[in-house]
């Protein structure tokens, strides 16, 4: 018996298929929403997502703003990169900081990674979505990153309280997406769901997408804590007694708040060298994210509470 498989994009390469699918998702999401927004974390996935969105609506301006939920604890290089992107004429960037966190001085040292993430990121995101009335938010999450993200749909319905219920997910057959929602509900849309980390890097190489320099190896001051290399990025970093930062050749596979982001030893200083490194690696991309190591604050639990 011969099985016939319909190819929606005959003659396209793997990356071209991914690109075409993502652009279709972005356009459909905008068509089905009243007030969309794109979450912008300054990382490589956000940079690829922004690049795809521009392709989707070129030569027009983006029909939605970018939203950066700021924790005040990102790397200095990330803020410099964000400000450079925000200065581009076709973009509108909203920066939101949870005022409760500012007032209480929430930080990863005194309050721990779980509370820091819950207050700054989860509650901050919900505040921003409510304040601006956004009914659909694009995110750069991919299914290969983490098991709870692997089972989330491309169009993910959130309750009026921004909660995710895995049991209420809708079928998405033949790339047919359903963005309908009840009053008060919103939708999170993930156009990069089917991309892998290697796909992202190969696309960055093909499209010459600029990135935060932290993704490339350089001598940086780090301390090792529980097997994780933490970069000393500013004078807020609290060193343990006798702890002395050492200059090591490292880079980051994933970026977040600098006291909670682990670097990896690397000599990859260019995109082709990073791609080569990706072809040989056997470790998880998010192994350096300290927030993922907190069993009481698993990714699925955070997503159910309203996290990205």
UniProtKB/Swiss-Prot annotation:
Pfam families named in the record: PAPS_reduct
Keyword Transferase recorded: yes
Region (Disordered): 286-308
Keyword flag Heme: no
Major enzyme class: transferase
Catalytic activity annotation: sulfate + ATP + H(+) = adenosine 5'-phosphosulfate + diphosphate
Gene3D superfamilies hit by this protein: HUPs
Enzyme Commission designation: 2.7.7.4
GO MF terms, alphabetically ordered: ATP binding; sulfate adenylyltransferase (ATP) activity
Gene Ontology biological process: hydrogen sulfide biosynthetic process; sulfate assimilation
Keywords, sorted A to Z: ATP-binding, Nucleotide-binding, Nucleotidyltransferase, Transferase
Superkingdom of this protein's organism: Bacteria
InterPro entries, per database record: PAPS_reduct_dom (IPR002500), Rossmann-like_a/b/a_fold (IPR014729), SO4_adenylTrfase_ssu (IPR011784), Sulfate_adenylyltrnsfr_sub2 (IPR050128)
Pathway, per record: Sulfur metabolism; hydrogen sulfide biosynthesis; sulfite from sulfate: step 1/3
Similarity comment: Belongs to the PAPS reductase family. CysD subfamily.
Biological function: With CysN forms the ATP sulfurylase (ATPS) that catalyzes the adenylation of sulfate producing adenosine 5'-phosphosulfate (APS) and diphosphate, the first enzymatic step in sulfur assimilation pathway. APS synthesis involves the formation of a high-energy phosphoric-sulfuric acid anhydride bond driven by GTP hydrolysis by CysN coupled to ATP hydrolysis by CysD.
Assembly and oligomerization: Heterodimer composed of CysD, the smaller subunit, and CysN.
PANTHER family: SULFATE ADENYLYLTRANSFERASE SUBUNIT 2
Listed name of the protein: Sulfate adenylyltransferase subunit 2
